[in-house]
């Protein structure tokens, strides 16, 4: 099941959060339709901006839209003209006051949506699909927070008459593990032979207790204080028998005790047999 379903929806409420956050009673269908229209508006006019994610949050009379982009300068525009245009279009679409937040993506190579968009752009420019997939995998695996990646292309690959699907994978991508932090992205490439779908799964470690494993992982002995052996208080153990020095005949003699006559017999027998 984890191989087929969208990884983000599969983990909702467990390790992932909703991309649209609002509450509605009778306006539920209307709000869903508006959310779809907002995402289409932002994706259609800002292909070059590298939008990784769009989050929508609603109140009674306001709509907040957070745009996560790799190139915030394109979204903002010169002196904020592009951002003002986007805000005006969103207010015209929703009929409410819109708060627009533009957030920069720090590592575009580790974002599945941006990786899929990059591969799709190369396919549109007639780059060989295997070369584009391998290049994307190599650049993603250089990131410290990426543990595994899978890239899949589906369609008339290489202009073949029959469509097929091919994928490359490196590292671990546990799609069935619910605590795994899986980033998923989908993008379609428009070529002369038709559409080619590009899907990307990126594994970034396990989320345990609300924290990512990579961030929470620390050396085992870093927090635990190191125990020091007290000098001169503990008797030394002999390596062969595992007893203290006072437990042997030599120890008893050194301590002023007389060795039992029957205790020396097994020792001598052992030495003669050896």
UniProtKB/Swiss-Prot annotation:
Domain of life: Bacteria
A single GO cellular-component term on record: cytosolic small ribosomal subunit
Lineage: Bacteria, Bacillati, Actinomycetota, Actinomycetes, Mycobacteriales
Name of this chain's protein: Small ribosomal subunit protein uS3
Biased composition (Low complexity): 238-266
Species annotation: Mycobacterium tuberculosis (strain ATCC 25618 / H37Rv)
NCBIfam families in alphabetical order: rpsC_bact
GO molecular function: mRNA binding; rRNA binding; structural constituent of ribosome
Matches recorded under InterPro entries: KH_dom (IPR004087), KH_dom-like_a/b (IPR015946), KH_dom_type_2 (IPR004044), KH_sf_prok-type (IPR009019), Ribosomal_S3_C_sf (IPR036419), Ribosomal_uS3_bac-typ (IPR005704), Ribosomal_uS3_C (IPR001351), Ribosomal_uS3_CS (IPR018280)
Keywords for the protein's UniProt record, in alphabetical order: Ribonucleoprotein, Ribosomal protein, RNA-binding, rRNA-binding
PROSITE patterns noted in UniProt: KH_TYPE_2, RIBOSOMAL_S3
Family: Belongs to the universal ribosomal protein uS3 family.
CDD domains, per database record: KH-II_30S_S3 (cd02412)
SMART domains: KH
Region annotated Disordered, chain positions: 215-274
Entry function: Binds the lower part of the 30S subunit head. Binds mRNA in the 70S ribosome, positioning it for translation.
Domain KH type-2 intervals: 38-106
């Amino acid at each position: 099941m984890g191989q087929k379903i969208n990884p983000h929806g599969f983990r909702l409420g467990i390790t992932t959060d909703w991309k649209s956050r609002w509450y509605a009673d009778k306006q539920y269908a209307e709000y869903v339709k508006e959310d779809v229209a907002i995402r289409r508006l932002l994706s259609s006019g800002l292909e070059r901006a590298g939008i990784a994610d769009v989050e929508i949050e609603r109140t009674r009379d306001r709509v907040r839209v957070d745009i996560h982009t790799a190139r915030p300068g394109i979204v903002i525009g010169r002196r904020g003209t592009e951002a003002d245009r986007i805000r005006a279009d969103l207010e015209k679409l929703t009929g409410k006051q819109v708060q627009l937040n533009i957030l920069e993506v720090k590592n575009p190579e580790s974002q599945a949506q941006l990786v899929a968009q990059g591969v799709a752009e190369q396919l549109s420019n007639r780059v060989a699909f295997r070369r584009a997939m391998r290049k994307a995998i190599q650049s993603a695996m250089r990131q410290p927070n990426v543990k595994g990646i899978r890239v899949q292309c589906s369609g008339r690959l290489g202009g073949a008459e029959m469509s097929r699907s091919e994928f490359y994978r490196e590292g671990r991508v546990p799609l069935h593990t619910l605590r795994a932090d899986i980033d998923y992205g989908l993008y379609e490439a428009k070529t002369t032979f038709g559409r080619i779908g590009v899907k990307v799964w990126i594994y970034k470690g396990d989320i345990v207790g609300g924290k990512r494993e990579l961030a929470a992982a620390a050396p085992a002995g870093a927090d635990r204080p190191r125990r020091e052996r007290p000098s001169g208080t503990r008797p030394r153990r002999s390596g062969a028998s595992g007893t203290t020095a006072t437990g042997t005949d030599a120890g008893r003699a050194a301590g002023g005790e007389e060795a039992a006559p029957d205790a020396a017999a097994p020792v001598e027998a052992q030495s003669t047999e050896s």
